[in-house]
Regions:
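Nucleotidyltransferase catalytic core that binds NTPs
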Residues: 1-199
Length: 199
């Protein structure tokens, strides 16, 4: 079994860490959890933040918290264009043909999942693992997903509610509430996001 967790990770924060830790708590026998940062258009990219920076920060998150068997996959970044989840999962399936795949997804996305490209094909490749449990049980799923309820699992998550975009909009003095010390240190050293930590 492997887990797939995608996102902008711009920057990686305690909410991401909570999802990762929850995955390993509920599925300790998994072979790996694969983090897949999205490709970010140069027109949307934050000032001074490169794909290399995001990959480095993800590696810092893994190492700082001693998270086992967690990898970073660059498949979407390498494409240099927007990727659809179905394309990414087909790549993962070709790379791990014998593994059961779980795709981690937030509750906001599960509510509009039927609008995703080839969502039925996604469910042929992977089971969905839903975090941020606003949906309490399978009877609360959107109507179009109820027939696939056997392919959808729920995972309790940490109480940290954050998004990378919301964090970027905060005063820098508040970033320590949402980022690990080593990531904050890296951001400061590299002068990312236009901020520097006060001395």
């Amino acid at each position: 079994m492997i887990g797939i967790f995608g996102g902008s990770f711009d920057p990686p924060h305690l909410g991401h860490l909570g999802v990762i830790k929850s995955f390993w708590k509920f599925f300790p026998e998994s072979n790996s959890l694969i983090l897949i940062p999205n490709y970010i258009s140069p027109f949307k990219k934050e000032k001074g933040v490169s794909e290399k920076d995001i990959l480095t920060m993800l590696q810092i998150l893994i190492e700082e918290n001693s998270i086992p068997n967690t990898l970073v996959e660059e498949v979407e970044i390498r494409k240099k264009t927007t990727s659809y989840t179905i394309e990414t999962l087909e790549f993962i399936r070709s790379k791990y043909p014998n593994e059961e795949i779980f795709f981690l997804i937030g509750v906001d996305n599960i509510k509009k999942f039927s609008l995703w490209k080839e969502y039925k094909r996604i469910l042929e490749i992977a089971k969905l693992l839903v975090f941020d449990r606003e949906i309490e049980n399978k009877s609360d799923l959107p109507e179009e997903l109820k027939e696939y309820s056997n392919l959808i699992l729920f995972m309790e998550n940490s109480k940290v509610k954050a998004s990378s975009s919301e964090i970027r909009g905060l005063p820098y003095s508040d970033w320590n509430l949402y980022l690990t010390p080593k990531i904050l240190e890296y951001i400061n050293e590299e002068e990312l996001y236009g901020f520097r930590s006060p001395n």
